[in-house]
Amino acid sequence: MAIKITFLGAGSSVFVRNVLGDCIIHPELEDLTFALYDIDAQRLEDSYLMLHAICAHYGKSVKMEKYVGVEELPQALTGANFLICAIQVGGYDPCTISDFEIPKKYGLRQTIADTLGVGGVFRALRTIPVMEMFGKMAEKYCPNAVFLNYSNPMGMLSGYMERYCNVQFVGLCHSVQVAVPKLFAGLGMEYDSRVQWKIAGINHMAWLLEVSKDGVDLYPEVKRRSKEQGYPENDKVRHEIMHRFGYYVTESSEHNAEYMPRSEERRVGKECRSRW
């Protein structure tokens, strides 16, 4: 069965490489068409060439189409089975910089500003009109497509799309997949396919409820190493949260320092705030 995947924001080369690159090498996915859409022609071309290089490296054949600008969006959407969205409206400079600088001016310091707080709201207000446009056009040109969104703030965008667009919408984040491997790497623990874990929670703050290997609970060893070795330099906030609440969280210490800057001030807050 032919599958058409439309990537909205295909100038996001890292997401294109990781997501569509996985699709290219996955043996169950054959007869693929990638419709790559962006408003930046040069960045779109870069992603297009990168995907061709990946196909050549793995000896795969994938049909690829490029679409630039809103005028070509209907063609990109028509007949799509899946939509993948990874956009940043306005670019990093000046928009994202302002998400930090404006709140900071009034004493509200943020370290990531893509999830909640003033920066998260700013980003949502910029992004919602574009997401709504995608959703309304998807209703017309690919009404049965599944809309997979990687854009932040994922929670706010997902809530809006669920309420105001008639599309099958799913919000995703890569932090769940990488949380346990990164935790183990920071503690010098071996990670392989036998490690099993269960995670549940909200975006950018899901909780690692269980982690085991061959039926053996590994949480005691994780906590022992964390205490005895000291918290990894780049992950102090999450380790502090784990020892206070009993569970490790999926999103980075940079994110969590922003969520709870006062609760962690005494032990790791000052260091994290200056570092991040």
Task: Please tell me what each predicted stretch does.
Residues 102:
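Short, well-ordered surface patches within globular domains
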Residues 157, 275-276:
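Short amphipathic alpha-helical segments with coiled-coil-like heptad repeat character
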Residues 2-99, 112-113, 120-191, 203-208:
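Metallocofactor- and cofactor-centric catalytic cores in central/energy metabolism, strongly enriched
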Residues 188-274:
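Long, compositionally biased stretches enriched for glycine and/or charged residues
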